[in-house]
């Protein structure tokens, strides 16, 4: 067998919050894949890091009264502790706020710039005339244009929940100097993504780099036309300064999404430095140099919401800077709990630490494995099904094989297994199934692998039920048959431990001690345990109790009063507004009514603006890339260009009408409508939602 050299990454968790079960889908999926490939004899390295840059980090640190550096250090320690609880076995865990990441970010930028792939243009923003700097929304305060509450931030009102643009604030002032800000233009740096369109079309369709559904979605983006990507941000900003900018101009910083994927390289370089001079030494260029692209493999596991960055920007950046591109990018769906999006009020927004206080992490690892496939599909953590499946499959089927057999062997035969297998055809069948299981693991068809493993467990239990060793033990002269039956059962149990080791590393480590063996690699399944002595059996796994799940849910519940949630007085205000004379047509007016059935046909969802760009050749359009909670983002055109710069809308949550028929336009296909209010002639305002709005939720 040829030993493959593989580098694997998971997307970097953001360093301003806790790890929750939704995050863990990806890290558990990646860890299982890495462990399975290592078990099959390949050389696999798994690296990750905290994504530690951006305005949000800076503001979080300010709220906590610490420096950004201390903030990200505290969060990284918490993240690593959570990952360890769930047995995520990184070879290295680093931070994007590192010298390695700075060096690689600057290297890539300079190579792109020198090759002519970087350009500049002016963007209009609020500016502090005293501090002489551009202001992010959270550095502007003023009077809310809706409810007149004072001292509200430049993106939303914490009193009435209204969201708005910073330029709409009344009596605005800079939180840094108290000065009244002015509108001013700023030079921003752009990466010329359209130059790489043909390369990306070829790359996304070659060598099975992407899942088919992802490649198809990318084709829609190609049809709509790629646009240049703003890679710069103005100070104040926590991140890396863009090098070599004119000395007479304000400092510019790399946008967090430029240096975040570079963090994969930085973490790997950090590991290379740690292992230098050891038997496990790694050569950075062996994995990342362009000429070695077909010698080694690089895989990124990501969520479906960041495909745009990993399948377009990232490979284009790498190709433009003469570095190797990923062998594959694997996207997964989101996590639902009890068929709905995670909810703090229902107690289903469950943090990793809260789960681990109540339940064993391997329960979740197995349940996720039983649900995950190679498709970009959401998975559902049904808590009742979770309890039943773990109790039935792991405790009732797998562990039960050992507990039913080991006692007879230890008590009557000093733990010795027979020298000859009494059921070679049965054991050969289960051994050969290992080939299918190994292939399912490699292809990320974990649910298929779990089904195959449980079929093997069923065969073992059927065999034990048929032979009834507990009854044979009472029959004089049947001692050899009892030993034969129990030895076959223990051998099958051993095979199941080989197959489950990538999913249940702690259970299988304990099983190795019981089985008195050192190796659970896939190759070891071909060597049956004959004339072998096992140790006394100890319980390997406990059943999940309903009370433990209930306690976890209760601990996860948050207060129903959240920032931006309507209060009674706000509801009264809304009701008053809707029943005012201006809002109610008189009995003599002939209003054009529609029935509730007609209105119900309109599907409106919360959408996150992944990207917003100008449309070359269209003076009225902006192009949105929207995450509406589906398998792939949507492309939507909106005629609001003269009222907004793209940067004002990127990252916002907006309302998208999602069941409009796709409209073919000169510049591509529009797959929905972004809702705005106002007069198209005098001014349109995009309706934005609070951060608490859940992507993909329907408006009611």
Swiss-Prot record:
InterPro entries: aa-tRNA-synth_I_CS (IPR001412), Anticodon_Met (IPR041872), M/V/L/I-tRNA-synth_anticd-bd (IPR013155), Met-tRNA-synth_bsu_C (IPR004495), Met-tRNA_ligase_1 (IPR023458), Met-tRNA_synth (IPR014758), Methionyl/Leucyl_tRNA_Synth (IPR015413), MetRS_core (IPR033911). Keywords: Aminoacyl-tRNA synthetase, ATP-binding, Cytoplasm, Ligase, Metal-binding, Nucleotide-binding, Protein biosynthesis, RNA-binding, tRNA-binding, Zinc. Zn(2+) binds at residues 144, 147, 157, 160. Its cofactor is Zn(2+). It holds the Pfam family tRNA-synt_1g. GO terms for cellular component: cytosol. Gene3D superfamilies: HUPs, Isoleucyl-tRNA Synthetase, Domain 1, Methionyl-tRNA synthetase, Zn-domain, Nucleic acid-binding proteins. GO terms for biological process: methionyl-tRNA aminoacylation. CDD domains: Anticodon_Ia_Met, MetRS_core, tRNA_bind_EcMetRS_like. Belongs to the class-I aminoacyl-tRNA synthetase family. MetG type 1 subfamily. Residues 577-587 have a biased composition (Polar residues). Homodimer. Its EC number is 6.1.1.10. A motif ('KMSKS' region) lies at residues 341-345. This is Methionine--tRNA ligase. A motif ('HIGH' region) lies at residues 13-23. Binds 1 zinc ion per subunit. GO terms for molecular function: ATP binding; metal ion binding; methionine-tRNA ligase activity; tRNA binding. Residues 562-587 are annotated as: Disordered.
